[in-house]
């Protein structure tokens, strides 16, 4: 996956790759969001209910096919093939589930249709089926889009300044510990974020997507959190009944492992879109909405780009115009490159190599403290890894 290493920036009609350690341009952009929007064909902002549903149906056909093959054929396979078939099913089904996760996430952005009720019903059913509290996540994710790359207000994968790093972390930077951290992050990171705000924005009190009194939510969002929780309870009850009827092992093989694969992809995708050794974070003295949202990176997941409905390689446009449907984002990305110039970022590094690099290099953030640093750069924080 990926067509080359190094972060790609544009200059006019050509593109160049930054050398490792070279920083992106972080000066305030010389264009506005309205100028970017003018470069995009108007039809890219149009949402088609029928076309959006076609992607849901398409994904359900694939998911049903994979389920049918596994449920009706795997027990007939010779014993050695049995151990190859199940991991293949888990990867394929988890990938399709990730595509459905992306569609539900688009519903939360009002990118599915022109009808909010339709968007919320579809998004609620899809996300709830994966044990995700739809409305609760919709609210916190909206905050992420409103505060991207803000050191104080971004909602998820917020890097810590060096002074706030745990004392023991310096013992976790060796390769074996890094492998363990990556594994735990991918498998448990998503549910731990939802349940306990792990890797989320710092709040003074307990924070959870399942607690309507969490500081994430306002008083008028209380009912939405309870509706989300009721949906999760219903799915847990359904899983309990399935386990009673078919056995826990069946539920784990057919549902739990693919959902875990989906969770891993969600963490991998969302973390790598805003984390790179060349990327800054801003404190309140330097941050603004456009500047923060341009700290976003398109990446290449190969054929999985299509399976994931291009959320991976059109993430820059998605952050600038989150209500744009995914099926128009590729055309919009091509259109905005000329306006964004060196503010458009793409990294074709093979994705697992990129993940290893980012986990190794992006440990904490600090501003430049040398004497040559300007006063404005004091509010610009860069990733570092020397503890």
UniProtKB/Swiss-Prot annotation:
Histidine box-1, short sequence motif: residues: 105-109
Keywords carried by this UniProt record: Fatty acid biosynthesis, Fatty acid metabolism, Lipid biosynthesis, Lipid metabolism, Membrane, Oxidoreductase, Transmembrane, Transmembrane helix
Pathway(s) per entry: Lipid metabolism; polyunsaturated fatty acid biosynthesis
Reaction catalyzed: a (9Z,12Z)-octadecadienoyl-containing glycerolipid + 2 Fe(II)-[cytochrome b5] + O2 + 2 H(+) = a (9Z,11E,13Z)-octadeca-9,11,13-trienoyl-containing glycerolipid + 2 Fe(III)-[cytochrome b5] + 2 H2O
A GO biological process held by the record: unsaturated fatty acid biosynthetic process
Residues spanned by motif Histidine box-3: 315-319
Family to which the UniProt record says this protein belongs: Belongs to the fatty acid desaturase type 1 family.
Entry comment, domain topic: The histidine box domains may contain the active site and/or be involved in metal ion binding.
Record-given protein name: Bifunctional fatty acid conjugase/Delta(12)-oleate desaturase
Species whose genome carries this gene: Trichosanthes kirilowii
Source taxonomy: Eukaryota, Viridiplantae, Streptophyta, Embryophyta, Tracheophyta
Gene responsible for this protein: FAC
